[in-house]
Amino acid sequence: MAAAVGLRGLAVAGGGESTDSEDDGWEIGYLDRASQKLTGLLPTEEKNETFKKALTTGDISLVEELLDSGISIDSSFRYGWTPLMYAASVANVELVRVLLDRGANASFDKDKQTILITACSARGSEEQILKCVELLLSRNADPNVACRRLMTPVMYAARAGHPQVVAVLVAYGAEVNTQDENGYTALTWAARQGHKNVILKLLELGADKMLQTKDGKTPSEIAKRNKHLEIFNFLSLSLNPLEGKLQQLTKEETICKLLTTVSDKEKDHIFSSYAAFEDLEIFLHGLGLEHMTDLLKERDITLRHLLTMRKDEFTKNGITSRDQQKILAALKELEVEEIKFGELPEVAKLEISGDEFLNFLLKLNKQCGHLITAVQNIITELPVNSHKIVLEWASPQNFTSVCEELVSNVEDLSEEVCKLKDLIQKLQNERENDPTHIPSMDEVSSWNNRILKRTAFTVCGFGFLLFICKLTFQRK
């Protein structure tokens, strides 16, 4: 066979499911154009080898020539992969289009590994993957068919960090809250991998952030376990007012809106045009940043996105340093960080200064103040009458049970703080009564001040007494 073979490559099954051998029968290299003219004279086995090389190099004209010579569009190569599956695995859009136009089966699967799943986990840019996925969906590929591990295409797209692909899959009917064999949803996979933009998109599309894995973990807890603390804090915020917004639209309206948003290549962060900005306007007004409203609306930046922006994203979106400082200061006030046990003062080892312990108590008190303010705000905003609630709520019993747990925890906290106060008072009393206690500089300074004051008062009194005595003596 007249082919100058370069590197030998491994075509990896979509979703990270590797094959059983290091050689899958694919040769990645360059074809001698002279050999292409002899395709009509090649035996079937050599035609298949030439066909594989043409697919590997993306030589569309040779692929079409081989198909015209009678080679099957659904040829089965080693491990059962078809030409379309391989083209999808490398996100070759033009090759996928040619094969589909020639009659390739978009719904083919090999051991439940579908072509759509292969495309969603392909190697390539999101733009190329998105086009491949759109082509397959337009040829009736089912977005809800799962692999052997019960992972669906939207889970693979979320795990790979492709928010636009996720949006298109959902627009074509993909279920966002399906769970795999471990109880992971698409949102859980995005949280595990730290893909913030995918999480934003999934929440807008109605993803349930309270669904738990088989070991009882929510997406926020999965994010925390994998050191994505920004996402953990973000998912721990109150419910998103836009959550499930798309589900109110018809399929045609959803596809139109999502594809319109996706086609804008100049935007790094994709947010749909249907988002509401009331919360954003209120937030900006409270900071005196009303002038930013139009800028953020033009860039389709929601409040949820704004609250999770990094400093470089602020600059990229035209937000000035002064405005950045106001937003970051507000976020710092809103943020209630979890205190890690490893960061607590080592009181038992007596390695803590008074200032450090005081700072710890002040920080704890400030966090309690934030929690009180948050609850007060919720009480103020909560509708008094049930008919004023626009969104569908779960059973009120769920809310009341959580509130009861909160009350119990607050009572426990109060009890523990009282114990801490009594302990500190006891230590203080013992310290004052300890004869071996060496007073600190502050105590010495305070004692010296008291001595000086008493001495001055005594001298003044004695002088005044002498003056009275002298005056009396002169009168006599």
Swiss-Prot record:
The modification Phosphoserine is found at S18, S21. It is found in: Cytoplasm. Its main location: cytoplasm. The keyword Cytoplasm applies. One of its GO terms (biological process) is male meiotic nuclear division. Coiled coil: none annotated. Pfam families: Ank_2, Ank_4, SAM_2. InterPro entries: Ankyrin_rpt, Ankyrin_rpt-contain_sf, Asz1_SAM, SAM, SAM/pointed_sf. ANK repeats lie at residues 46-75, 79-108, 111-145, 149-178, 182-211, 215-244. Interacts with DDX4, PIWIL1, RANBP9 and TDRD1. Plays a central role during spermatogenesis by repressing transposable elements and preventing their mobilization, which is essential for the germline integrity. Acts via the piRNA metabolic process, which mediates the repression of transposable elements during meiosis by forming complexes composed of piRNAs and Piwi proteins and governs the methylation and subsequent repression of transposons. Its association with pi-bodies suggests a participation in the primary piRNAs metabolic process. This is Ankyrin repeat, SAM and basic leucine zipper domain-containing protein 1. It comes from Dasypus novemcinctus (Nine-banded armadillo).
